[in-house]
Amino acid sequence: FSELNNLENISMFDQYSAICGISMTELTSVMKPDVEGLGDALGLTYDECLEELRLYYDGYHFSKHSEDVFNPFSLIRAMNGQAIESYWFGSGTPSYLIKSLQKYHVNVMDIETKGVTIDDFDVSPEQMTSALPLLYQSGYLTIKAYKPLTKSYQLGYPNNEVRIGMLRSLAPNYLSPVSIDNNGLVTEFVDFLYDENIEGAMNRLKAYLSSISNRLSNKNERDFQTVFYLIFNLMGAFIKVEEESAIGRADAVLQLPNTIYVFELKYDGSAEDALRQIDDKGYLIPYTASGKKLVKVGVNYDSDQRTIGEWIIRKG
């Protein structure tokens, strides 16, 4: 068995990076009829269906210069089921993953990381000193960028299926322990936004936070930020939730077909201060040429009441 000492780990080699997935080239050639059939079933054009599949199942990179690959399990399930759903998480989120995140005190906002070395995530389980190797090797995180100068990697969620599935799995630890309550808040909030009833959305959010106020007791500002991070990012299953831009970002930017909502949140501050920060930091600038209505929402969280104290809504 001396040969076993000479095994070579090829998992980070560019030439093998697409061996376990389906590439865009394969999807648009060999599987093109399947994409067309799925698009017909969903009332989407070929290009629209391709984009939905990309957002939900693409995005895996397993080396420095890897091409994008799709999750084959979910992609094939989508073709067979004629629906774009979260199939991978339907198979169950391992309890040991959640326990590992708790063991290593991983905050949900810090799961996506920048500036890590290969030794931080491409190691065997017995050498783990953080949850990063487990998250990467089990497919919850993937390589998003590589910087040759520092030989560092940026890791992040590969796609919407994984991001939303992970956040839904973690939500009961921070929000209501009853998943249906959390999902109900998110879908109702989004419905209010589509109806352009931002007052209704904020009142619904305030009532929800009041209903879980016992879970918000003895929480600090960081915990408050985590709660809002989860709520707004869970909306990414239904609407576009913006990521950080070159000039920074507001706490939440939600894009609908005709309107863009920019939220800034304060903890024991004032809603006016929140609006002022949106203007001072230029959070609206990236969206001024979008042709959509811009709406600013300044929100203040009252730690004594353990819910939203006030909010102010203004057109951009």
Describe these PLM feature segments.
Residues 231-257:
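Active-site metal-binding core of divalent-cation-utilizing nuclease and nuclease-like domains
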Residues 1-4, 147, 266, 298-303:
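A short beta-strand-to-loop transition that corresponds to the Sensor-1 phosphate-sensing loop
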Residues 1-220, 235:
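Phosphate-binding site recognition
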